[in-house]
Amino acid sequence: MTKRTSAKYKIDRRMGENIWGRPKSPVNRREYGPGQHGQRRKGKMSDFGLQLRAKQKLKGYYGDLTEKQFRRIYGEAERVKGDTGENLIGLLERRLDAVVYRAKFVPTVFAARQFVNHGHVLVNGKRVNIPSYRVKEGDVIEVRERSKQLASVLEAVSLAERDVPDYLEVDHSKMTATFVRTPHLGDVPYAVVMEPNLVVEYYAKN
């Protein structure tokens, strides 16, 4: 098992949920957490526990972001007009690695980060190797010509369990994606329930 594969399954086990909806997730086979005490019945979670869990789930979903990275994004969401939770989702979905994952250019968000880091992605015709790069409406994201036949790309395109959301216009024959608009929470095809409102509550108290 690769380090990236291990990381994503570790997050699933930690959360006790198959947060990316992957068929091979270990939580599909059991309903308890990792470790020797994982089978003990869980008590009712406190409000703080629910808020912390919501934050950890979102951080994990986008590639196990560090607290510093996530807190910075949250701070931006807080400063923008509108609902902070919705703003947070919009900013996370505008990350280049998130767009590469959503477009089904790679099979996992971890692979998306590496894919961008290694220079396989162009934005408006220019190579961008920063996973946190923030795309704008109308930006065209594409896989470099020499990277289109990589095994990870071919695997991702064939994945039936993942749909491309309607805020992207994707042409897999050309391996291009246009970022049409910033999504709202209800637009994002999460495999599990995400609760950014609880993240807002968490940071309001901590």
From Swiss-Prot:
InterPro entries: Ribosomal_uS4, Ribosomal_uS4_bac-type, Ribosomal_uS4_CS, Ribosomal_uS4_N, S4_RNA-bd, S4_RNA-bd_sf. GO terms for molecular function: rRNA binding; structural constituent of ribosome. GO terms for biological process: ribosomal small subunit biogenesis; translation. The keyword rRNA-binding applies. Keywords: Ribonucleoprotein, Ribosomal protein, RNA-binding, rRNA-binding. Residues 94-157 form the S4 RNA-binding domain. Residues 18-45 are annotated as: Disordered. PROSITE patterns: RIBOSOMAL_S4 (PS00632), S4 (PS50889). SMART domains: Ribosomal_S4 (SM01390), S4 (SM00363). Pfam families: Ribosomal_S4, S4. GO terms for cellular component: small ribosomal subunit. It comes from the Bacteria. The keyword Ribosomal protein applies. CDD domains: S4. Part of the 30S ribosomal subunit. Contacts protein S5. The interaction surface between S4 and S5 is involved in control of translational fidelity. NCBIfam families: PRK05327.1, rpsD_bact. One of the primary rRNA binding proteins, it binds directly to 16S rRNA where it nucleates assembly of the body of the 30S subunit. With S5 and S12 plays an important role in translational accuracy. Belongs to the universal ribosomal protein uS4 family. This is Small ribosomal subunit protein uS4. It comes from Ruegeria pomeroyi (strain ATCC 700808 / DSM 15171 / DSS-3) (Silicibacter pomeroyi).
